[in-house]
């Protein structure tokens, strides 16, 4: 094997150094979370986050939950079905599903194979059918007197994680909630207001930067921005309303 010349070694080291500089990860604390910012840096980031929220709200005044529903129960089911599936596909499936099983009691009594057949096109239909039937059973039992309105209660339902619970709280009950979906995660990381890869940690990071009464609207606006402008592969910097505030404007 030939030895590298000094020049070749320097070139190689230079390339590695540049690549490391471009992809340097956020420093992590011993607990695995990004290292804490200084108080001054956190205040500055909060100001930037609030300006980003203002600009996105102006850009997407129609931002809202895209899942069709008429009740918290229907939104719960639709959100479970939306895992690893587009909202458009879910909206094609739910009209017939809710026509056949319009209430938690009806869905709890449904034949699991019939549920699977109705939701097959949303993917992972075995697990989703089990979750929505299980959640419906709980709603018709423990929560018959009233739909759960706290994140703690919602998280006890089969198939319900923080994302689903926050969707329901923010949309149906006007409870401040941050919904970390694929678009929200990508956009907040790109613009630099979230550093973690963990959805729960991203929720905490963003919540610390914005007033609670803006959480739900910001979630919708960021998701719209991710769909319409800040695409995964080719973000449209030319028409991005927050490009001047974005850490990734040169990608």
Protein language model regions, located:
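Polybasic, lysine-enriched low-complexity intrinsically disordered terminal tails
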Residues: 1-43
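Catalytic cores of DNA base-excision repair glycosylases
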Residues: 37, 41-251
